Amino acid sequence: MGRVSDFAKAWQAWHEAREAGLRATDGWLAISSIRWLGAEPERYADVPGEWSGSDATAIVTLAEGESLGDLGPGTHVLGPLDEDGVRLGFEGGIAEVAARPGGPIVRPRRAGAANLHAYVETPTYPADPGWVRAATYEDGRVVFEHVGGEHRLAAEVEDDGRLWVLFRDATSGVTTYAAMRQLLLPAPDAEGRTEIDFNRATNMPCAYTDFATCPVPPPGNTLPFAVEAGEKIPEFARL
């Protein structure tokens, strides 16, 4: 009983931290738009400045009285940018400026964003230790057993050694977000051993906003069974 209780408490603390992060005024729910920058300078209602850009470089011209982070009036070149980009604060929000394969973007986050105020919660399946699986990392794939069968999921190695997995399963589009969910696994040990905790399967940002750009699961990362663990489809109120 003590072990189950400790497991449930740890999961609950993780879930509450996850919800707090989603509700943050600099989080995914706070995004008010995504702007793809082109050669012609444009001004947008939800972020200061006149914007243009190409490839991995953005250009912003700020008028008198406008500022972004430490940038004041004048023309500023931001780049070369990567996918993480930079974040520049302004009165009432934050401007994320980043590179994408289609060119640079500016993506404002504002405390008054409609999605942030409409968000209710992300329901979950009950935490269940039975959805924790021993696994091994072999040739770019996480290998584990479920109901007597072996399954493999392609994984990417993060900078800190942990494994990032995008997957679909029989709940996708039914009780969980249709496109995919994600998992972050502990870094494998010297013999490749790790662990999958499906209770911590989370939604990608595109489950919360139309202004996110998300990858898709690799071919073969659709599990043939229902993973009744982790996050379900987010709930929003009608405003």
Provide a role label for each language-model segment:
Residues 1-9, 16, 239:
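Actinobacteria-biased recognition of intrinsically disordered, low-complexity terminal regions
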Residues 15, 19-48:
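N-terminal beta-hairpin/loop module of FHA
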Residues 89-145:
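Surface-exposed beta-loop interaction hotspot
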Residues 145-189, 199:
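Acidic/His-leaning functional-site neighborhoods
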Residues 193, 201-239:
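Extended, aromatic/histidine-rich regions of cofactor-dependent oxidoreductases associated
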